[in-house]
C-alpha cells in the first residue's frame, strides 16, 4: 500500500508474481468471485496469469467473464514468443467454456511493457479469431513520458500509428490524454474502462471521464485488481467515480448518478460486446440481476433509485444475485460455493506465496 505505481509494480508486485502458480491463481480467483457475487457483480473482465485456472473458478462459481493472459515482453524476442504461445493455449482451452459464460480476449499489458512486434501480433490474432483486446494505456504521466521518449508519440497516437486501435479494444485507465487523443479514440471506436479508486490510491491521476462521455465515448467502470483498490465492490466504485469527477471539474453536476450507473451496467456490457445480452433488464436478454434490500436505514426514504444506489448503497446491501438465470446468492447466502472453504483456501495460498518471496 501507499506506493507509486512504478515502485509498487517493480519492487513488490512483479517480484511476488514470479512465485505464482496455477493453484494460487485459482484460489485468488475463487475468492474474487465470492466477493463479486456478494457485492452484485455478474460479469467481469480480467487480465492475469494461469487463466485456465481462473476460467475453472468462473465455471464453478456461475459467473460470466472475459479473461486474457497478461502479456509482457520488454522487447525480448523469446519472451514475446512465449506470451503469444500461452495466449493461443488459453484461447484454445478456455474460449466458450461454461456454456459460453467464459470468453477469451487478448491481454497485452501496455505500450511501455510490450514491444511493437508483440502488439502487432496481438492485432493480427484479434482479427483472425474475432477477439477483444484488453490493454492498460496512459495510466500515469511516467508511462506517457516513456512512450514519447521511445516512440516519439503519446501512447494512443503510437498505438494508432501501428494499426492497433479499433472497436475491439478495451483500454483501461486512460488518465492522461490529449484533446487529439480523445478525438482519435472516438473515431476508432475504442472502449474505455475507468478505475477511479485504483487511480487515486496510486496517485496516478483522475481520468477526464466527464469530457470523454460528453465526446460520445463508451466509458465503463472497473475496480482494477484488489491489490490496488483494495476491494471489488462496484457499488462503492460508482460513488467514487461520481465524486472524483465533481471535484476534478469543480462542478456538482459532473457525472450524475444516472450516468455513472450506466457506466457500471450497460456501458460495461457494450465494452465487452454483450449489450444485446446483458446490461439492462429487457425481454430476450439474459437474466443477470442483483436484488438490493431497500429497507435499510441508510436507504430510507427510498425515492430516487439511481441516487440511492450510487451515493448511499454499498455492496453489503445486495441480498440476491442471479447470473444467466441461475441463483448464485439468495438472501445473502451463496448457493454455488462454500464461502468458509474459499476463504480458508485463499488465506493458505496467500501465506504460502508470501513465504516464498
What function would you assign to each model-found segment?
Residues 53-176, 180:
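Metal-coordinating catalytic core of metallo-dependent amide/deamination hydrolases
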Residues 201-203:
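Helical hairpin unit composed of two closely spaced alpha helices linked by a short loop
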Residues 262-357:
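Active-site microenvironment of metallo-dependent hydrolases
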Residues 1-26, 61-76, 81-84, 141-168, ...:
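Active-site gating loops and adjacent loop-to-helix segments of metal-dependent hydrolytic enzymes
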Amino acid at each position: 500500500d501507499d506506493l507509486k505505481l512504478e515502485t509498487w509494480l517493480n519492487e513488490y508486485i512483479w517480484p511476488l508474481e514470479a512465485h505464482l502458480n496455477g493453484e494460487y491463481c485459482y484460489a485468488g480467483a475463487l475468492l474474487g468471485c465470492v466477493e463479486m457475487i456478494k457485492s452484485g457483480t455478474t460479469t467481469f473482465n480480467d487480465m492475469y496469469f494461469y487463466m485456465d485456472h481462473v476460467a475453472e473458478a468462473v465455471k464453478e462459481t456461475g459467473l460470466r467473464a472475459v479473461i486474457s493472459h497478461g502479456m509482457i515482453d520488454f522487447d525480448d524476442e523469446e519472451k514475446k514468443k512465449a506470451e503469444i504461445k500461452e495466449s493461443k493455449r488459453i484461447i484454445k482451452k478456455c474460449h466458450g467454456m461454461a456454456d459460453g459464460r467464459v470468453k477469451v480476449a487478448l491481454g497485452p499489458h501496455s505500450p511501455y511493457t510490450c514491444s511493437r512486434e508483440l502488439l502487432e501480433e496481438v492485432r493480427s490474432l484479434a482479427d483472425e479469431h474475432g477477439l477483444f483486446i484488453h490493454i492498460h494505456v496512459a495510466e500515469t504521466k511516467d508511462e506517457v513520458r516513456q512512450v514519447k521518449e521511445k516512440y516519439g508519440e503519446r501512447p494512443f497516437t503510437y498505438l494508432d500509428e501501428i494499426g492497433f486501435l479499433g472497436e475491439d479494444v478495451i483500454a483501461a485507465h486512460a488518465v492522461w490524454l490529449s484533446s487529439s487523443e480523445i478525438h482519435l479514440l472516438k473515431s476508432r471506436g475504442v472502449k474505455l474502462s475507468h478505475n477511479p479508486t485504483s487511480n487515486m490510491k496510486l496517485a496516478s491521476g483522475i481520468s477526464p471521464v466527464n469530457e470523454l462521455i460528453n465526446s460520445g465515448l463508451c466509458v465503463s467502470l472497473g475496480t482494477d485488481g484488489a491489490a490496488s483498490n483494495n476491494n471489488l465492490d462496484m457499488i462503492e466504485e460508482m460513488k467514487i467515480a461520481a465524486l472524483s469527477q465533481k471535484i476534478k471539474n469543480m462542478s456538482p453536476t459532473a457525472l450524475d448518478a444516472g450516468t455513472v450507473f450506466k457506466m457500471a451496467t450497460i456501458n460495461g456490457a457494450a465494452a465487452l460486446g454483450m449489450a444485446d445480452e446483458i446490461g439492462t433488464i429487457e425481454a430476450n436478454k439474459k437474466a443477470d440481476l442483483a436484488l438490493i434490500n431497500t429497507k435499510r436505514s441508510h436507504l430510507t426514504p427510498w425515492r430516487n433509485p439511481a441516487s440511492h444506489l450510487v451515493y448511499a448503497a454499498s455492496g453489503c446491501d445486495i441480498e440476491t444475485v442471479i447470473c444467466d438465470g441461475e441463483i448464485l446468492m439468495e438472501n445473502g447466502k451463496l448457493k454455488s460455493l462454500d464461502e468458509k472453504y474459499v476463504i480458508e483456501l485463499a488465506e493458505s495460498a496467500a501465506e504460502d506465496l508470501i513465504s516464498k518471496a
